[in-house]
């Protein structure tokens, strides 16, 4: 078996892919890594995973460290702070050096590179539409602050479907949650002050928190309140009641991102500037948290 270190010095190829993700709490990111790892291993690549912890500085440091000869290319999802700052110089520098980058989930249109996403707007539209089809009208949205790209797109999908059904948008029902620490009080406030019959949550954590707080108030799920969440993770499958979710197909997303990156790495000599954005299908998995 050839010695990898010797080979990489000879070819200037490390056969290693750097992954930078914003956090590891969400099951979604774990599934994406798993998909990347599968394809990387099938193609003889190793994977190094770094966390930006939603911090711009940490994202830059991780990138500089990995671009310093220890990886051939990157797969990443942007941190909240990077999206807020709209500062992508670190990505631009790496791309200018000729290192391929694939962005997934939280992307920016300001960066020219390959991307893998779901149609966040359409997925939120379909999930809200599903709730409306069950005769529910007062649908609250638990989302992120607008500078997080996926939160903004999911909010747009929710607004579009209400508009299409002629349901008036009530801003009091749109709860933008900055971070998980304030999640409880914001959701509690919503349940105390608004009469709602459904919730769309942009992640599982918001959904399970809403269910827990609602049940503590004697609100029955799904009789009094239906809940749908993004991400088909472990929480949704095992919470009581189980949660109706939009599956983001993280494994598929990871596999696709790795395939795109490796294709770029192996193309090498042929300058192919046509960047692609691949859209992964989502599907609604109906469980106990919504009216049948």
PLM feature spans:
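Short beta-strand elements in bilobed, periplasmic/extracellular small-molecule ligand-binding domains
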Residues: 40-51, 141, 159-183
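Alpha-helical recognition/docking segments in bacterial nutrient-uptake
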Residues: 12-129, 191-192
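Short, solvent-exposed amphipathic alpha-helices that sit
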Residues: 28-42, 123-127, 149-168, 209, ...
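Flexible loop/turn connectors
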Residues: 184-292
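Hydrophobic alpha-helical segments within soluble ligand-binding/sensing domains
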Residues: 114-141, 156, 160, 180-188, ...
């Amino acid at each position: 078996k050839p010695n990898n270190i010797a080979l990489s010095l000879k070819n200037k190829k490390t056969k290693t892919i750097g992954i930078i993700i914003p956090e590891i709490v969400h099951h979604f990111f774990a599934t994406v890594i798993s998909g990347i790892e599968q394809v990387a291993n099938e193609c003889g690549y190793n994977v190094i995973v770094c966390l930006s912890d939603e911090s711009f500085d940490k994202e830059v440091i991780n990138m500089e460290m990995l671009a310093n000869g220890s990886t051939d290319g990157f797969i990443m999802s942007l941190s909240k702070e990077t999206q807020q700052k709209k500062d992508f110089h670190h990505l631009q520098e790496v791309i200018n050096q000729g290192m391929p980058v694939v962005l997934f989930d939280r992307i920016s249109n300001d960066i020219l590179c390959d991307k893998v996403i779901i149609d966040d707007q359409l997925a939120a539209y379909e999930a809200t539409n599903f709730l409306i089809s069950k005769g529910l009208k007062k649908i609250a949205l638990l989302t992120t602050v607008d500078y997080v790209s996926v939160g903004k797109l999911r909010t747009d999908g929710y607004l579009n479907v209400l508009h299409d059904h002629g349901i008036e948008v009530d801003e009091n029902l749109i709860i933008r949650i900055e971070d998980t620490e304030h999640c409880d009080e914001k959701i509690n406030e919503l349940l105390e002050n608004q009469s709602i019959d459904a919730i769309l949550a942009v992640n599982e954590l918001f959904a399970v928190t809403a269910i827990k707080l609602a049940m503590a108030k004697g609100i029955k799920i799904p009789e009094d309140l239906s809940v749908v969440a993004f991400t088909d993770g472990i929480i949704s499958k095992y919470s009581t009641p189980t949660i109706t979710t939009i599956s983001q197909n993280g494994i598929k997303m990871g596999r696709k991102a790795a395939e795109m990156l490796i294709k770029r790495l192996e193309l090498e000599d042929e300058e192919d500037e046509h960047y692609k954005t691949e859209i992964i299908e989502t599907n609604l998995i109906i469980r106990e948290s919504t009216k049948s």
